[in-house]
Amino acid sequence: MSHDISKIVDSVVRQVLSDGESALKSPKAVKRPIPDRMTLAAAKELIGAVEKKAVEMGVKAVVAVSDASGNVVAVECMDDAYIASYDIAVNKAFTVTSLKMPTKDLAVLAAPGGSLYGIQFTNNGKIVIFGGGEPLMNAGKVIGGLGVSGGTAEQDTKLGEYGKMYFETQM
């Protein structure tokens, strides 16, 4: 047994000396496949990532994640976030799953003369037509929605886009 340990130690020392990197380093993280449905664990991870970015930006946000049907999977309110931001974030997550498009894209379409003029007054007022909502996709299929509210429309849009990018590249 001590002979086996000696071989392992020799191997580690040789590797450290040969390439200058520690053989004891943990292996690089392996990217996981994008989930095929929204789970509570995935929603919590995504919310945590968006909240971290919101802190960096100085935004007190509410972050909501829904499943493919627009039903809430998880919502978190950062300290001192606006009370109204809760419903707005949840409704952004609903909107993007319902219409399969980012909420920022609805502003032009919902303007007078636009092809979706007045859509924000449908679905009991749950359709949001300003930035901060992003559909979460896997293989071209919407599996969930992300809604962020608490900053300006531009800040919410940036946080939503960050969340979508995180979902696509880090999860």
Which residues make up each language-model segment?
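Flexible, solvent-exposed loop/hinge segments and secondary-structure transition points
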Residues: H3-M171
